[in-house]
């Protein structure tokens, strides 16, 4: 029996009334763009795409050549199809409406074109993260404000991980599914349907080098994880950290765990490291659709009403019971302080 292609999967979702034709075509365009990015990434040094681009993004971070290339691939692929009203990228200061020469559709697309790009020169898995919102009604030329919707309003989200194989992980609000790129056929095929994150776990992913900057509930929570079976938790935990959110979250979707990037006082002006609109919201939806949870430590990520396009938040996501435990530490600390 032949495997289900992404095209067939999306058509079936349309026939079931879960997506419309425009959303189906938009996701297909994003998938094709990800295929192009996968080819560029896989060329590495042979394609002359490694190293810094000599420019910075709105966050003040140095851009890699592949950041710029991936951003341009996604913008160009989505400009002319008639499905989008505007795009927003982690690599751009402001959103970009579809040019006037092309028809505009009903959707807004947000993306991190190459998450984890600081690892690209050492051949670690990187990926593209994307989120789809509906454009507010009666907005002819959407600007940044049109994108400021809570994550619960997302109608689709996904990421494409460029590793030993290229995989597209997607939700349209009815489960989380993984598709693997068949390079010979040039199409994604369904390889894991309805991914499920185990409710309990003994693995956590965090950058321990920032420990001295954490607030008290984080110090207590991770301290108890490290204490193992002799400590308050009564079981041993393993730590994993790839420093590529796509790779860390993909592992959690595959076998469970909790991914943590907490608030820290290293730069108190920033509420967190990760971007709400480009990283936390799409990953939060994917994880929740796979039976997991996604919180800031104090509130559900998908409930946050954003106030700016490049807003940052702390992130705790993964196995439901472990996320709840981390939240409990934060709430207990806050309650004790009154």
Curated annotation (Swiss-Prot):
SS bond partners: none
Gene3D superfamilies, per the entry: 3.40.190.80, Fructose-1,6-Bisphosphatase, subunit A, domain 1
A molecular-function term among this protein's GO annotations: magnesium ion binding
Pfam family, one: FBPase
Catalysed reactions listed for this entry: beta-D-fructose 1,6-bisphosphate + H2O = beta-D-fructose 6-phosphate + phosphate
Enzyme class: hydrolase
Residues reported in the UniProt entry to bind substrate: 115-118, 207, 273
Gene Ontology BP, a term: fructose 1,6-bisphosphate metabolic process
Residues that bind Mg(2+) 2: 112, 115, 279
Keywords linked to the UniProt accession: Carbohydrate metabolism, Cytoplasm, Hydrolase, Magnesium, Metal-binding
Residues at which Mg(2+) 1 binds: 90, 112, 114
Major site of localization recorded for this protein: cytoplasm
Family, per entry: Belongs to the FBPase class 1 family.
Protein name: Fructose-1,6-bisphosphatase class 1
Taxonomic lineage from the root: Bacteria, Pseudomonadati, Pseudomonadota, Gammaproteobacteria, Lysobacterales
Gene of this entry: fbp
């Amino acid at each position: 029996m032949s495997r289900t292609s992404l095209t067939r999967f999306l058509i079936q979702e349309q026939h079931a009334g879960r997506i419309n034709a425009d959303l189906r075509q938009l996701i297909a365009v994003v998938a094709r763009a990800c295929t192009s990015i996968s080819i560029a990434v896989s060329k590495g040094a042979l394609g002359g795409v490694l190293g810094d681009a000599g420019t910075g993004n709105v966050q003040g971070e140095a851009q890699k050549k592949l950041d710029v290339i991936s951003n341009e691939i996604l913008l160009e692929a989505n400009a002319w199809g008639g499905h989008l009203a505007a795009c927003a990228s982690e690599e751009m200061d402001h959103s970009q409406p579809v040019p006037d020469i092309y028809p505009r559709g009903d959707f807004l697309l947000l993306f991190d074109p190459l998450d984890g790009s600081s690892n690209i020169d050492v051949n670690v898995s990187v990926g593209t993260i994307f989120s789809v919102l509906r454009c507010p009604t009666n907005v002819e030329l959407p600007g940044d404000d049109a994108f400021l919707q809570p994550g619960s309003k997302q109608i689709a989200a996904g990421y494409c991980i460029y590793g030993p194989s290229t995989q597209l992980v997607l939700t349209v609000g009815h489960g989380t599914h993984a598709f693997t790129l068949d390079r010979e056929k040039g199409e994604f095929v369904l390889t894991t349907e309805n991914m499920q994150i185990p409710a309990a776990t003994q693995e956590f992913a965090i950058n321990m080098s920032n420990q001295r900057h954490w607030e008290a509930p984080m110090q207590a929570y991770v301290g108890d994880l490290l204490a193992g079976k002799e400590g308050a938790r009564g079981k041993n935990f393993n730590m994993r950290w790839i420093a590529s959110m796509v790779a860390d979250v993909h592992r959690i979707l595959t076998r469970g765990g909790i991914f943590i990037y907490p608030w820290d006082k290293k730069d108190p002006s920033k509420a967190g490291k990760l971007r709400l609109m480009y990283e936390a919201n799409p990953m939060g939806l994917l994880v929740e659709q796979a039976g997991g949870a996604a919180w800031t430590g104090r509130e559900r990520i998908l409930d946050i009403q954003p106030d700016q396009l490049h807003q940052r938040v702390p992130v705790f996501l993964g196995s439901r019971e472990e996320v709840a435990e981390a939240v409990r530490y934060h709430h207990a600390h806050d309650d004790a302080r009154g």
